[in-house]
Amino acid sequence: MNDYINGLLHKIDDKYLYIELNNSGYRFLYLKTDLKDLKLNQNNQVYVAINVIDNVFKYYGFKNQLIRDLFELLININTIGEKTAFLILENYNYNELIDIFKNGRTDKILQLKGIGNYTARLIINSVQKELFNNKISDKKNKVITSLEKLGYKTKDIYKIIINIDEDMNIEDLTKYVLEQLSYLHN
């Protein structure tokens, strides 16, 4: 697979970039936020991602390698497709996304139309595990869900639970997180 191509951008429509390289034409889905950095009728370097769904190859072109890498990470999460990945990447820049993922800011992901609580948590957990080696165990997920039902903010719970040792049982873990949450709100 190619990491990137550098070719003549000869057409852009609502969905695709059309790039010619060595007398071959390539068509890429693209982020609308990349439009400002693309130059029509000039050579453009585009970072490539490929997704195969039901034996259909889809090619994606990105102006930024880090954004392309985040896209690949997102579409490899179960139930997250290109539309959800594009929605996230078009609404936040790279640094904002890293902050959102690092700090477990599900509230920011939930602001996007069509993304519910389960999906937002799945995205945050998966990206944290991949980028920051933060794995949320089933035990911690049960505590998070319980405290959310009691009305606590997911982002506050995450800030605390990420750094807690796995050795505690669910009751002790819940008590500890509740205690820490009380300090946050005082």
Swiss-Prot record:
Cited Gene3D superfamilies: 5' to 3' exonuclease, C-terminal subdomain (1.10.150.20), Nucleic acid-binding proteins (2.40.50.140)
Chain intervals for the UniProt region annotation (Domain III): 137-186
Protein's UniProt keywords contain DNA damage: yes
Region (Domain II): 64-137
Taxonomy, superkingdom: Bacteria
Molecular function in Gene Ontology: DNA helicase activity; four-way junction DNA binding
Alphabetical GO biological process terms: DNA recombination; DNA repair
Sorted UniProt keywords: Cytoplasm, DNA damage, DNA recombination, DNA repair, DNA-binding
Keyword Translocase: no
Annotated region described as Domain I, given as residue ranges: 1-63
Region (Flexible linker): 137
A cellular component term, taken from the record's GO annotations: cytoplasm
InterPro entries tied to this protein: Hlx-hairpin-Hlx_DNA-bd_motif, NA-bd_OB-fold, RuvA, RuvA_2-like
Annotated localization: Cytoplasm
Family to which the UniProt record says this protein belongs: Belongs to the RuvA family.
Physiological role: The RuvA-RuvB-RuvC complex processes Holliday junction (HJ) DNA during genetic recombination and DNA repair, while the RuvA-RuvB complex plays an important role in the rescue of blocked DNA replication forks via replication fork reversal (RFR). RuvA specifically binds to HJ cruciform DNA, conferring on it an open structure. The RuvB hexamer acts as an ATP-dependent pump, pulling dsDNA into and through the RuvAB complex. HJ branch migration allows RuvC to scan DNA until it finds its consensus sequence, where it cleaves and resolves the cruciform DNA.
Domains as described in the record: Has three domains with a flexible linker between the domains II and III and assumes an 'L' shape. Domain III is highly mobile and contacts RuvB.
Quaternary data: Homotetramer. Forms an RuvA(8)-RuvB(12)-Holliday junction (HJ) complex. HJ DNA is sandwiched between 2 RuvA tetramers; dsDNA enters through RuvA and exits via RuvB. An RuvB hexamer assembles on each DNA strand where it exits the tetramer. Each RuvB hexamer is contacted by two RuvA subunits (via domain III) on 2 adjacent RuvB subunits; this complex drives branch migration. In the full resolvosome a probable DNA-RuvA(4)-RuvB(12)-RuvC(2) complex forms which resolves the HJ.
Protein's name in the database: Holliday junction branch migration complex subunit RuvA
